[in-house]
Amino acid sequence: MSIRTSIALIGILFAISIYTVLLVVYVSTLSQNGSGCIYATLVDSSLYDAKNFTWEQYNSTLIYTALGNKLPLDGGFDDFSDVCRTYLVNLTSISGLASHVSTKPKIRSVVGTRNCVTYLWRIHIQSLSSSLGLYTIFYVIREWRRMFGVVRFEDDAISTARYTKNYAARVISSVLLNTTYTKMSRFMCEIMIYKNALSRTFKDDPISFLFHHPIAAVLIITEGLVRLGAQCLCLATLSMYFVPCEKVLSKWFLSITGIFIGIIICIELSLLLAPGPVDGAAMLGETKQVKKDECALETSPSGVHVFCSNCCASLISNILIKVLYILFMIILIVTIVRYERTLQIALFGRAYLP
């Protein structure tokens, strides 16, 4: 069950990443071709009515003019509609052509504009990026709960011996200090025994357990809310089919969007409806056999040298992990901000960020 869930979550992360990249490429193509603008137009300006306009994609064979020489309404969200207004022609400059029989059907009076490149960026690309981040956070929180928190099924638990700091301390003590460091392993074993006891209580009566352990309840609820937020942001892509900007999307891209949404829904439903593991029947007073190697520890020699080496292994591993984590976060944040700014300038000519 746990392995299948982890594989499913990794599959969701992979699907969101691939679709987001495809959407960015498609939006870049729209921006370069100048086909990312749509207009709320009236064929006959004398029949002006806010309910009678129709949205249509920019067409270079048509003539677009502002109704009454007034700037049309934009689409909101600070959507750079000034880019779309550059295609508008002053009505007075074509007054002679407007009365011509062959030209009049090509004139469109514009009452509103919308830059769909900005809409797709602000609404969908950023929502998918947030969904990807929330799914990643959920995956990390879930793995930590499986290692240090309570779980309902034994198959969902992860041995605390796999804790990164425990492994780092063991490697440093073995490779650099030529000694055997078991203090962290013993501590992880004690945590695992305590965690297993809490998990049995949680499995027998989850509601009472969460009532008596409010911190665990808050953490589990937070984990669920993070996943729910990721699902909502991801499925918000469905709105792409019901907005005027749907006109700038090709049929093949709409098909890819439908396939992507279908994959996410199928994976989430499979995780929701998948049955849990069946516990074997046990006789009264019978206890399950514990794995012999679960808390097996090597005996380490004693002495001042070994004590100093163990302290060094613990300190060095702690500092090393924190330094690597800080460097990773700095590089990740700088890369994301710089890439987003560069991409916004390429798409819109300017960026939201200063």
Swiss-Prot record:
Cell location: Host cell membrane; Host endosome membrane; Host Golgi apparatus membrane
GO cellular component term of the entry, any: host cell Golgi membrane
Residues the record marks as carrying a glycan: 33, 52, 59, 90
Any Gene Ontology biological process: symbiont-mediated induction of syncytium formation
Keyword Membrane: yes
Cytoplasmic side: 142-171, 227-252, 337-354
Stretch forming the signal peptide: 1-31
Source organism superkingdom: Viruses
Keywords: Glycoprotein, Host cell membrane, Host endosome, Host Golgi apparatus, Host membrane, Membrane, Signal, Syncytium formation induced by viral infection, Transmembrane, Transmembrane helix, Viral primary envelope fusion with host outer nuclear membrane, Viral release from host cell
Sequence ranges on the Extracellular membrane side: 32-118, 195-205, 274-315
Topological type in the membrane: Multi-pass membrane protein
Annotated TM spans: 119-141, 172-194, 206-226, 253-273, 316-336
Pfam families according to UniProt: Fusion_gly_K (PF01621)
Tagged with keyword Transmembrane helix: yes
Subunit structure: Interacts (via UL20 interaction region) with protein UL20 homolog (via N-terminus); this interaction probably plays a role in the coordinate transport of protein UL20 homolog and gK to the trans-Golgi network (TGN), and is required for the cell surface expression of gK.
Family: Belongs to the alphaherpesvirinae glycoprotein K family.
Name used for this protein in its record: Envelope glycoprotein K
Gene transcribed to yield this protein: gK
